[in-house]
Amino acid sequence: MSVSIKPLEDRIVIKQVEAEQTTASGLVIPDTAKEKPQEGVVEAVGPGRIDDNGNRVPLDVAVGDKVIYSKYGGTEVKFGGQDYLVLSARDVLAVVVR
């Protein structure tokens, strides 16, 4: 899916992966007890920041990458009826490789 949000500089738009609804033993987890998700799929990537020499520094992630990001990083936004997270590239901790 292509998002019509174009992030600026080193920002990334992420679609969060939903938190588990039940435990391995089948217990339902109430919304108040769920942890904030830290995984998501990259939907859009900015062009990168400009370094001190005026060169553009490309980002290490691409659209479609599954990433793990800082628990409290980013800003939640609603666009086109969908919830997204816009965060800085430095808030991305790792790319999940399968």
Curated annotation (Swiss-Prot):
<dbReference type="InterPro" id="IPR037124">
    <property type="entry name" value="Chaperonin_GroES_sf"/>
</dbReference>
<dbReference type="GO" id="GO:0051085">
    <property type="term" value="P:chaperone cofactor-dependent protein refolding"/>
</dbReference>
<keyword id="KW-0143">Chaperone</keyword>
<dbReference type="Pfam" id="PF00166">
    <property type="entry name" value="Cpn10"/>
</dbReference>
<dbReference type="GO" id="GO:0005524">
    <property type="term" value="F:ATP binding"/>
</dbReference>
<dbReference type="GO" id="GO:0051082">
    <property type="term" value="F:unfolded protein binding"/>
</dbReference>
<comment type="function">
    <text>Together with the chaperonin GroEL, plays an essential role in assisting protein folding. The GroEL-GroES system forms a nano-cage that allows encapsulation of the non-native substrate proteins and provides a physical environment optimized to promote and accelerate protein folding. GroES binds to the apical surface of the GroEL ring, thereby capping the opening of the GroEL channel.</text>
</comment>
<dbReference type="GO" id="GO:0051087">
    <property type="term" value="F:protein-folding chaperone binding"/>
</dbReference>
<dbReference type="GO" id="GO:0046872">
    <property type="term" value="F:metal ion binding"/>
</dbReference>
<comment type="subunit">
    <text>Heptamer of 7 subunits arranged in a ring. Interacts with the chaperonin GroEL.</text>
</comment>
<protein>
    <recommendedName>
        <fullName>Co-chaperonin GroES</fullName>
    </recommendedName>
</protein>
<dbReference type="InterPro" id="IPR018369">
    <property type="entry name" value="Chaprnonin_Cpn10_CS"/>
</dbReference>
<dbReference type="InterPro" id="IPR020818">
    <property type="entry name" value="Chaperonin_GroES"/>
</dbReference>
<dbReference type="GO" id="GO:0005737">
    <property type="term" value="C:cytoplasm"/>
</dbReference>
<dbReference type="GO" id="GO:0044183">
    <property type="term" value="F:protein folding chaperone"/>
</dbReference>
<comment type="similarity">
    <text>Belongs to the GroES chaperonin family.</text>
</comment>
<dbReference type="InterPro" id="IPR011032">
    <property type="entry name" value="GroES-like_sf"/>
</dbReference>
<keyword id="KW-0963">Cytoplasm</keyword>
